[in-house]
C-alpha cells in the first residue's frame, strides 16, 4: 500500500491542564512535536475542531469515537432569523445546531481540539496497567517501522489465540469442510446466498430479522434517558448520532453539505425522525413470524430474513425521499426571499445498527468502510476422490490444510469492505448514466463536474440540477444551461444490509474529506496500526492529525502554518472532515469467545 508505517508517528495526547503554549515562528511538521489538547472549554481562538466520544456504560456493544474538522467558515443559514442565532427557519426541530458547534445528551461528550507545539523529538503517550491495577502513563520515544509492525503482529496473535480457545474454530472448520463436500471436483464451494440486485439496490441475503418493532419509541423523546444523542457541525458538515440503550440500536448520519448550510441543517433536524416513522410503518404491517416459520425461512436460504431486510432498506430510502420533498416544499415557500436555497444540497450517509445487522444508505461520496479479517481462500483445498484413499487420513489432511488457511488470514492485515457506493464523476458508471440520460446536452459533464458545478452525481437538495423551475428561480449569474426537463442529478440512494460476524473489527464512517489523503485500505491500516500500539487512545483524533499533516505537506508548509490559517481560507488546503469510528472487536463478540 502507498502509506508508510512511519507516518503513524503521533504526538502524546496530553491533557489541556498539562500546559504548553505555542512556540514562536513557523516550523516544519517534521521538526516539531505537535499535539492536540482536549479542552473542555469550547471556542478557543485557535480551536481547529471537536472530538466526540460516547460513554455508554449500559450499552457495551460498541465504542464510538468521532472527530469534526472544519475548513469552511461557520456560515449563517440563508433563512436565519434576525435574532443572531443563525438557525434556519427551515428547521423546525426542537434542537437546532445552527448557532452551536455541538450539543448532546449526557452519555456523549465533545471536546475542543487545540494545537500544542513542543521543542525536541516527537514523543508518544500510552497507558499500561501497573501491578496494583491502576493505570499509569509512560512516555515512549519515536517508534520505528519494526516496533509498529511488532505491535500489529502481537495484536493479531492475541486475536488468533482468543479465537482458538473455544468452539468457534471447530464450527468454522465444520462449515468449511461441509462447503467442500458440496463442491465440485475442483473444490470450489457453491454460492449459497447470492446478492440480489433490485433496481440498483444491493441486498446481501445473509441475515435475519433485525430491527425491533419498538423502534418508534426511540423517536418519541430524544431527551429520554433511554436514548442518547449527539449532534455537531464542522463547517458545512453535520453529524447526528442516536443510541438507544434500551433497544440496543444506533443511528449515525453524516451530511456533507455544499453551497450553504440549510440542506444539512434540515437533514440533521428531520431525517432521523422520518426514518423512525417509516420503520414503524414497515414493522407494524404484520405480526412477527412464529419461531417455526422463522426457522423454515432460515432453511430456505435466508429468504424470510432477506425480505425483512429489504423492507427496512426500502423504508430508509422512503424516509430520505420524503425528507427531500419536505425540504423542497419549505424552500418553495421561501423562494422569493431566498432563491439560493435551490443551490444548496448535501451528500448523505446513514448507518443504522441493530445487534449484528448493519443497514447503510448513501447518496454522494461519503463512505462507510468495514474493517474485517479476510476470509480464507479454500479454492485450492481439494477433497480426494476414489475409494482407494484412506478416508480418515485424507479428511485429517483436509482439515489441516483448512486450518492453515485460517491461520494465514488471522495473521494477515485487515481488509476494507466498502458498504456504500460512490456517486461522483470519478465513477465511470455514473458519468455514463448521466450522459445517456442527456444525449441532447453534450455539456452535461464539463470539467469533470455535472454542468460544470458538482463533482457528486447524486445528492439531497440541489434543486437547480433537478428541475428547470429551480434553475430559473436563481439569479442569472448562478443559472446553468438547463437542456430539456430531465434531472441531471438525483437523490436515489444506494442501500445495503450487512450482518456482522466475528471477523468484523471496526466501522469507519466519514465524509469524503478523509479520502482526499487516504485510500480506504490505507485508512483501515492506519487505524489498525494505531489501535495496536495505543488501544486506549482515540483513533478518530489520530486520523484528524494525519489529515492535517498530509494537507500541510501537500501544500509545502509546516503543520502550524496550516493551523494559523483562518477557518474559511483553510478550505484551499483541506475539506471539512467528519469521522465516526465504531469499534466492534471484543464488544459484540465477547460472549462467543
UniProtKB/Swiss-Prot annotation:
EC identifiers of the protein: 3.1.3.16
Cofactor binding summary note: Binds 2 magnesium or manganese ions per subunit.
Pfam families documented for this protein: PP2C
Catalyzed chemical reaction(s): O-phospho-L-seryl-[protein] + H2O = L-seryl-[protein] + phosphate; O-phospho-L-threonyl-[protein] + H2O = L-threonyl-[protein] + phosphate
Residues binding Mn(2+) 1: 256-257
Swiss-Prot/TrEMBL cofactor(s): Mg(2+); Mn(2+)
Major enzyme class: hydrolase
A molecular-function term among this protein's GO annotations: protein serine/threonine phosphatase activity
Residues of the PPM-type phosphatase domain: 221-584
Domain of life the protein comes from: Eukaryota
The keyword Transcription is annotated on this UniProt entry: no
Keywords, ordered alphabetically: Hydrolase, Magnesium, Manganese, Metal-binding, Protein phosphatase
Binding site for Mn(2+) 2: 256, 512, 575
Keyword Magnesium (UniProt): yes
GO biological process, one term: signal transduction
Biased composition (Low complexity): 126-137
Disordered: annotated span: 123-142
Family: Belongs to the PP2C family.
Protein name (database record): Putative protein phosphatase 2C 46
Species: Oryza sativa subsp. japonica
Amino acid at each position: 500500500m502507498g502509506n508508510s508505517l512511519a507516518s503513524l508517528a503521533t504526538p502524546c495526547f496530553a491533557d489541556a491542564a498539562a500546559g504548553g503554549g505555542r512556540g514562536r515562528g513557523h516550523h516544519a511538521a517534521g521538526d516539531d512535536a505537535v499535539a492536540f489538547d482536549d479542552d473542555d472549554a469550547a471556542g478557543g481562538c485557535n480551536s481547529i475542531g471537536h472530538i466526540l466520544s460516547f460513554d455508554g456504560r449500559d450499552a457495551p456493544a460498541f465504542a464510538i469515537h468521532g472527530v469534526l474538522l472544519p475548513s469552511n467558515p461557520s456560515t449563517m443559514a440563508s433563512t436565519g432569523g434576525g435574532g443572531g442565532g443563525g438557525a434556519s427557519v427551515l428547521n423546525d426541530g426542537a434542537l437546532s445546531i445552527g448557532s452551536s458547534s455541538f450539543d448532546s445528551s449526557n452519555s456523549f461528550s465533545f471536546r475542543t481540539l487545540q494545537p500544542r507545539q513542543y521543542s525536541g523529538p516527537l514523543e508518544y503517550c500510552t497507558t499500561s496497567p501497573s501491578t496494583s491495577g491502576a493505570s499509569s502513563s509512560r512516555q515512549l520515544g519515536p517508534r520505528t517501522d519494526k516496533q509498529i509492525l511488532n505491535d500489529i503482529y502481537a495484536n493479531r496473535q492475541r486475536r488468533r489465540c482468543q479465537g482458538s480457545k473455544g468452539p468457534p474454530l471447530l464450527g468454522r472448520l465444520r462449515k468449511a469442510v461441509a462447503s467442500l463436500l458440496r463442491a465440485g471436483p475442483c473444490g470450489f464451494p457453491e454460492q449459497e446466498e447470492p446478492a440480489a440486485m433490485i433496481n440498483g439496490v444491493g441486498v446481501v441475503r445473509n441475515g435475519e430479522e433485525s430491527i425491533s418493532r419498538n423502534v418508534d419509541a426511540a423517536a418519541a423523546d430524544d431527551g429520554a434517558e433511554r436514548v442518547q444523542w449527539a449532534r455537531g457541525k464542522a463547517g458545512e458538515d453535520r453529524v447526528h448520532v442516536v443510541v438507544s440503550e434500551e433497544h440496543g440500536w444506533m443511528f449515525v448520519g453524516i451530511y456533507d453539505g455544499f453551497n450553504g448550510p440549510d440542506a444539512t441543517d434540515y437533514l440533521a433536524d428531520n431525517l432521523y425522525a422520518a426514518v423512525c416513522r417509516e420503520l414503524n410503518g414497515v414493522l407494524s404491517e404484520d405480526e412477527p413470524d412464529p419461531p417455526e416459520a422463522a426457522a423454515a425461512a432460515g432453511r430456505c436460504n435466508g429468504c424470510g430474513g432477506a425480505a425483512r431486510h429489504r423492507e427496512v432498506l426500502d423504508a430508509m430510502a422512503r424516509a430520505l425521499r420524503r425528507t427531500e420533498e419536505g425540504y423542497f416544499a419549505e424552500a418553495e415557500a421561501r423562494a422569493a426571499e431566498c432563491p439560493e436555497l435551490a443551490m444548496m444540497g448535501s451528500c448523505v450517509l446513514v448507518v443504522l445498527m441493530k445487534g449484528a445487522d448493519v443497514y447503510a444508505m448513501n447518496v454522494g461520496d461519503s463512505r462507510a468502510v468495514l474493517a474485517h479479517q479476510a476470509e480464507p481462500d479454500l479454492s485450492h483445498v481439494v477433497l480426494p476422490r476414489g475409494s482407494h484413499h484412506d478416508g480418515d487420513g485424507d479428511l485429517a489432511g483436509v482439515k489441516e490444510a483448512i486450518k492453515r488457511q485460517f491461520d494465514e488470514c488471522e495473521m494477515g492485515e485487515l481488509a476494507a469492505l466498502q458498504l456504500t457506493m460512490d456517486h461522483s464523476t470519478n465513477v465511470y458508471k455514473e458519468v455514463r448514466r448521466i450522459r445517456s440520460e442527456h444525449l441532447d446536452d453534450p455539456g452535461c459533464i464539463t470539467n469533470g463536474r455535472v454542468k460544470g458545478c458538482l463533482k457528486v452525481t447524486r445528492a439531497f437538495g440541489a434543486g437547480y440540477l433537478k428541475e428547470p423551475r429551480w434553475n430559473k428561480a436563481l439569479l442569472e449569474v448562478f443559472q446553468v444551461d438547463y437542456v430539456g426537463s430531465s434531472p441531471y442529478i438525483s437523490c436515489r440512494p444506494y442501500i445495503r444490509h450487512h450482518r456482522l460476524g466475528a471477523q468484523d473489527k471496526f466501522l469507519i464512517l466519514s465524509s469524503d474529506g478523509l479520502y482526499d489523503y487516504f485510500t480506504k485500505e490505507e485508512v483501515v491500516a492506519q487505524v489498525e496500526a494505531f489501535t495496536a500500539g495505543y488501544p486506549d487512545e482515540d483513533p478518530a483524533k489520530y486520523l484528524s492529525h494525519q489529515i492535517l499533516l498530509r494537507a500541510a505537506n501537500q501544500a509545502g508548509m509546516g503543520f502550524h502554518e496550516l493551523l494559523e490559517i483562518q477557518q474559511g481560507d483553510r478550505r484551499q488546503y483541506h475539506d471539512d472532515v467528519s469521522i465516526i469510528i465504531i469499534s466492534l472487536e471484543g464488544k459484540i463478540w465477547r460472549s462467543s469467545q
